From Swiss-Prot, chains A, B, C:
Pfam families: Lum_binding. Catalyzes the dismutation of two molecules of 6,7-dimethyl-8-ribityllumazine, resulting in the formation of riboflavin and 5-amino-6-(D-ribitylamino)uracil. The gene is ribE. GO terms for molecular function: riboflavin synthase activity. 2,4-dihydroxypteridine 2 binds at C47, L48, T49, D61, V62, M63, P64, E65, T66, G100, H101, V102, K135. PROSITE patterns: LUMAZINE_BIND. This is Riboflavin synthase. One of its GO terms (biological process) is riboflavin biosynthetic process. It is an enzyme of class 2 (transferase). 2,4-dihydroxypteridine 1 binds at G4, I5, V6, S144, S145, T146, S158, V159, I160, P161, H162, T163. Keywords: Repeat, Riboflavin biosynthesis, Transferase. Its EC number is 2.5.1.9.
Length: 215, 215, 215
């Protein structure tokens, strides 16, 4: 469980591909300070398990399913990545539960600086936008962001200078691919609501429905 | 409160059945290192209270309700079990919010190795799947897992080699029974949504309802 | 933050009432071992601030609001109370997240011993049950408990012998009043869902809604 507050940006030291899976070695200082085997660390928003570590670097295994559903394939030696350790038990209940299970990717289609904020338009599938809500939360490469604009195929988020300087947002350009996790609560509500609708709409609003209700 | 990151596997030393309840004596080293009477330890995902301990073993009481709702009845002397101590205040939520209150059991119906991941199909009741969501979390024998496939009667989780080697997943086969805890967040939202649906549908659609909405 | 694992039962030495507020002096040994002015101690699940202490006793002030919302008024000299210190940095969440902010009281309406567990039916307001969920957590007089039964106006919890012997559950009878705190995660999600419902229901049922449904 994470909160979407990036702790530091690390650097890819090595990428070992074996068939469809991958092992990443990442240089970092803060998240390795108390690391142990089996710990969970979010790498660009993807929850990965630490399988090895030394002073200032750690290694993680990436399953085929995860490689396929994220932007990890676009990484190379020297790439910068957002890093966050799992939420600490005495941490604050942030406004946003992030599981680190990425739902898909999006493409940056517009970057616009307005006063002290930068607006990013992200093109993404309706499968993802359907569970989102205006002013709701979305995680972009592990960064918890607020949704300022929303349509069937795009989302607009606005990022403050501090977040840009502390994350890989600073390395992004129009055309960049980012990992997207939709807010957990929205996903649950969408599924429950549509399962109920499904059961209800199997009983479509028919003439009989009205007569049952005395019309 | 747990997080679904198993700390070690212990071994059943003795099982004492009294009527419908049970007392288990479990050999372990890591979770007994700082154990105290009254501590909570998750045994195959079930939160149990320590009622006795010595150097490398501890004893727990199991209520009839818990014996009935879980796979504990299938254990025997020498069985391996997953163990996790309650979240430490300075610990991290490497998995998700796990209460240790098991919701039911599931049967493993398929095990498939794909590259560096192993996929498990679990057959379980619609009463449990109704509160789950794709890419959501589920606890299997105390192991925090990601839902990669979901239907009314089954869930597919994928487990990385590290987790398999560190837990009793390594002892499981098709037909094995596992304990399931559904994600707490999903259960809450499901109940709230259906209570709201219930209150809404109790207000049958009346003449007044239509006029209020301008028809 | 507490976790609902009672450390010891203390004894009321003195109760000083001033208008609607109250000062309690409580005899205890364990929780006074490292006590300091300003520390938080949960008394029957109520987070109170230590305003004075000597070897084996401490004093706390109780605000009118807290006196009104809890069962403290029912205490007298010699009454036993459940005590728990705030989570220490190296403590463990053996129960669940407990804030010590009591939501209300409940009346015990049934006590039934079944094998090695005792079941308690608690009558409480729908305002409290609405945020609860089956197999979820609830705090009863500061004791973290699992919800085994739930209806609009009642909750059933089951308590193991160890917990009964270590807490004031042993002094309770049918008719006793207990303090209730509902699970923090449930309250948080309930509020979040109803805020979202409010935003949705502002979009009244329009002509379009009906034409979409074929009318």
């Amino acid at each position: 469980m994470f909160t979407g507050i990036v702790e530091e940006t690390g650097t890819i030291q090595a990428i070992k591909k074996t068939g469809l899976s991958m092992a990443l070695t990442i240089a970092a200082s803060k998240v390795t300070s108390d690391v142990r085997l089996g710990d969970s660390i979010a790498v660009n928003g993807i929850c990965l398990t630490v399988t090895g570590f030394s002073d200032n670097q750690f290694t993680v295994d990436v399953m085929p399913e995860t490689v396929k559903a994220t932007s990890l394939n676009g990484l190379s030696k020297g790439s910068k990545v957002n890093l966050e350790r799992a939420m600490s038990a005495n941490g604050r209940f942030g406004g946003h539960f992030v599981s680190g299970h990425v739902d898909g990717t999006a493409e940056i289609t517009r970057i616009e600086k307005k006063s002290n904020a930068v607006y990013y338009d992200l093109k993404l599938s309706p499968e993802l936008t359907k569970t989102l809500v205006l002013k709701g939360s979305i995680t972009v490469d592990g960064v918890s962001s607020t949704i300022f604009g929303l349509s069937d195929e795009s989302v607009t988020v606005s990022v403050i200078p501090h977040t840009i300087s502390e994350t890989i947002f600073r390395t992004k350009a129009v055309g960049s691919i980012v990992n997207i996790e939709c807010d957990m609560i929205g996903k649950y509500l969408y599924r429950f609501l549509h399962k109920t609708e499904q059961t209800k709409s199997n009983q479509t609003i028919t003439e009989a429905f009205f007569s049952e209700n005395g019309f």
